[in-house]
Amino acid sequence: MAFQIPRGTQDLLPGETEKWQYVEQVARDLCRRYGYEEIRTPIFEHTELFLRGVGDTTDIVQKEMYTFEDKGGRALTLRPEGTAPVVRAFVEHKLYGSPNQPVKLYYAGPMFRYERPEAGRFRQFVQFGVEAIGSSDPAIDAEVMALAMHIYKALGLKHIRLVINSLGDVDSRRAHREALVRHFSDRIHELCPDCQARLETNPLRILDCKKDRDHELMASAPSILDYLNDESSAYFEKVKQYLTMLDIPFVIDSRLVRGLDYYNHTTFEIMSEAEGFGAAATLCGGGRYNGLVQEIGGPETPGIGFALSIERLLAALEAEGIELPIHRGIDCYVVAVGERAKDETVRLVYELRRAGLRVEQDYLGRKMKAQLKAADRLGASFVAIIGDEELEKQTAAVKHMASGEQTDVPLGELASFLIERTKREE
């Protein structure tokens, strides 16, 4: 029987993994520049965390979670998103008592959702996320959005758009909820079954419906921006002011509510506008979650964050025709001619690697010509040929693959020679 990977997952082979490593490293470096530190949480958590943290009326909880019972009878769930686990760790380890506030964290890792696989959407996918917990300053909202935009710009993306909205505070959302119920009640039967159920449980989520997004009831729905109280409106104005000061263009979409229940005040998405990118145009989403820490058992603590999909980021780079500056070649391929030379190259290759060089050798007993072809396929900058004659002189015949120039180099000086030459070519 030939086994295949489960539906909605993917294997990342050499040549692809380097792209992932590159974009993740760019994101990590920028996070450190902005003062964020890495946190790592388990891949599975107690199911109750997501019921309370994400919201038991959300599609994620109702339809998409991978939940199982362990041998001790505990209900556990593969994490479908990263914010609730990070906030759980923040509360469990009492990071709210840290003298360094706000606590600024980033994470990267696989998430799991039982969704219909399609372009840009997987059942196992990798999120890179940021959380800033402990500040209700609108400036940190702007910083978080600036960091997200900085990551995309640093990778060369040009056709992206920042979309923002405000969901306001508790009072603003309550007034908006009542207006939505009045608006949809008489004609709710025209919408999908999910929307009909949401009218009772969470009317705001009707605006996030993908099936009925073009229905005229959606277009005429009351805008949250008309129900913001003075405090919420002033907060949103300050966020917009900071974004303008940072020269970060944005558009406002009053229907942007996000698919998680913990959001309030600022919500945002970064969209790809690349031609032909398709339906998965949302690259990144985030917002403020001032009640989540308290919901998970901690003190009342504000927070804001975002998560981006690495898969969609790479798809956006491809859509814009951006080639990442990845060098897959090696510094040197050591060619052994004869058994005596083979014994010497085993030791020599190890020494060159210890010196910091990327080095390969033959393990298939190939002739010199075949070894040289292998070196070329691996993108070797140099080959070092060692045969009986070179062993007698304790040298290697070093050939520069690009120019064909060949030089005899003492074995004891080979590492320093290669280091100096490879640095010169960088």
UniProtKB/Swiss-Prot annotation:
<dbReference type="GO" id="GO:0005524">
    <property type="term" value="F:ATP binding"/>
</dbReference>
<dbReference type="InterPro" id="IPR033656">
    <property type="entry name" value="HisRS_anticodon"/>
</dbReference>
<comment type="subunit">
    <text>Homodimer.</text>
</comment>
<dbReference type="GO" id="GO:0006427">
    <property type="term" value="P:histidyl-tRNA aminoacylation"/>
</dbReference>
<comment type="similarity">
    <text>Belongs to the class-II aminoacyl-tRNA synthetase family.</text>
</comment>
<protein>
    <recommendedName>
        <fullName>Histidine--tRNA ligase</fullName>
        <ecNumber>6.1.1.21</ecNumber>
    </recommendedName>
</protein>
<dbReference type="InterPro" id="IPR045864">
    <property type="entry name" value="aa-tRNA-synth_II/BPL/LPL"/>
</dbReference>
<dbReference type="InterPro" id="IPR036621">
    <property type="entry name" value="Anticodon-bd_dom_sf"/>
</dbReference>
<dbReference type="GO" id="GO:0005737">
    <property type="term" value="C:cytoplasm"/>
</dbReference>
<dbReference type="InterPro" id="IPR004154">
    <property type="entry name" value="Anticodon-bd"/>
</dbReference>
<dbReference type="InterPro" id="IPR015807">
    <property type="entry name" value="His-tRNA-ligase"/>
</dbReference>
<dbReference type="Pfam" id="PF13393">
    <property type="entry name" value="tRNA-synt_His"/>
</dbReference>
<keyword id="KW-0648">Protein biosynthesis</keyword>
<dbReference type="InterPro" id="IPR004516">
    <property type="entry name" value="HisRS/HisZ"/>
</dbReference>
<dbReference type="InterPro" id="IPR041715">
    <property type="entry name" value="HisRS-like_core"/>
</dbReference>
<keyword id="KW-0067">ATP-binding</keyword>
<keyword id="KW-0547">Nucleotide-binding</keyword>
<dbReference type="GO" id="GO:0140096">
    <property type="term" value="F:catalytic activity, acting on a protein"/>
</dbReference>
<keyword id="KW-0030">Aminoacyl-tRNA synthetase</keyword>
<dbReference type="GO" id="GO:0004821">
    <property type="term" value="F:histidine-tRNA ligase activity"/>
</dbReference>
<keyword id="KW-0963">Cytoplasm</keyword>
<keyword id="KW-0436">Ligase</keyword>
<dbReference type="Pfam" id="PF03129">
    <property type="entry name" value="HGTP_anticodon"/>
</dbReference>
<dbReference type="GO" id="GO:0016740">
    <property type="term" value="F:transferase activity"/>
</dbReference>
<dbReference type="InterPro" id="IPR006195">
    <property type="entry name" value="aa-tRNA-synth_II"/>
</dbReference>
